[in-house]
Amino acid sequence: MKWVAATVMYDGSNFYGYQSQPTFRTVQDEFEKALKVIFKKEIPSYACGRTDTGVHAVGQVISFKVENENMTEKNIKDALNAILPEDVYVKEVKEVKEGFNPRAEAKKRIYHYFIYISEDPNIFLRDRVWWIPFALNLEKMRQAAKYFEGEHDFTSFKTGNDERNPIRTIYRVRIIELRKDLILIRVEGKSFLKRMVRNIVGSLVKVGTDVWEVEKIQEILEAKKRALAPASAPAQGLYFYSALF
């Protein structure tokens, strides 16, 4: 018996999130169905991040136990990719310590959010980015992003049904102009509340459109009221990029 961790990428467009749902298509269900085909039994899996409906992943980490020690990591990777649907792909499989749970053991999670800035939409990117038809003030957004860094009570930036401890630590928020029409918001933290990254992005865009002043972010953080923050940024622009252990 051994434990392995798979690094997985998926297009979240046609998934009702990562976590198993009784009546909807999810990444976890597709992954565990593939495991059952390979190993002829139900095998539970443990993921680093439970992405929401429409959210993508570049480096999701999923661990599980393998009883057939004769299967190499490459064998497992190839077998999974032969069975998984075309919108899920295993990039790597490696052996890990017994009982490894990436959700509990991740020291850092990194999310990327892409914003497409153009007068006209690019229909081929409609499930990949948030299209905004006007320029953003990136310098103001960078100043505002500093307020999110450090340990804070993120009650104002979570969904109402998330009852977990709202104290979270954000290591870094970067606003990167990849091209004149493509902005990357990179958020690094130990762990996140439900929709927290999308709520952060939505607030930064409010600053970038000059609707809010930079200091508004601090005001909303201190108020601890979700109603004061704007709507979440759309799901399709968000990617679970990687995790560090």
From Swiss-Prot:
<comment type="function">
    <text>Formation of pseudouridine at positions 38, 39 and 40 in the anticodon stem and loop of transfer RNAs.</text>
</comment>
<keyword id="KW-0819">tRNA processing</keyword>
<protein>
    <recommendedName>
        <fullName>tRNA pseudouridine synthase A</fullName>
        <ecNumber>5.4.99.12</ecNumber>
    </recommendedName>
</protein>
<dbReference type="InterPro" id="IPR020097">
    <property type="entry name" value="PsdUridine_synth_TruA_a/b_dom"/>
</dbReference>
<dbReference type="GO" id="GO:0031119">
    <property type="term" value="P:tRNA pseudouridine synthesis"/>
</dbReference>
<dbReference type="GO" id="GO:0003723">
    <property type="term" value="F:RNA binding"/>
</dbReference>
<dbReference type="InterPro" id="IPR001406">
    <property type="entry name" value="PsdUridine_synth_TruA"/>
</dbReference>
<dbReference type="InterPro" id="IPR020094">
    <property type="entry name" value="TruA/RsuA/RluB/E/F_N"/>
</dbReference>
<dbReference type="InterPro" id="IPR020095">
    <property type="entry name" value="PsdUridine_synth_TruA_C"/>
</dbReference>
<feature type="binding site">
    <location>
        <position position="111"/>
    </location>
    <ligand>
        <name>substrate</name>
    </ligand>
</feature>
<dbReference type="InterPro" id="IPR020103">
    <property type="entry name" value="PsdUridine_synth_cat_dom_sf"/>
</dbReference>
<dbReference type="Pfam" id="PF01416">
    <property type="entry name" value="PseudoU_synth_1"/>
</dbReference>
<feature type="active site" description="Nucleophile">
    <location>
        <position position="52"/>
    </location>
</feature>
<dbReference type="GO" id="GO:0160147">
    <property type="term" value="F:tRNA pseudouridine(38-40) synthase activity"/>
</dbReference>
<keyword id="KW-0413">Isomerase</keyword>
<comment type="similarity">
    <text>Belongs to the tRNA pseudouridine synthase TruA family.</text>
</comment>
<comment type="subunit">
    <text>Homodimer.</text>
</comment>
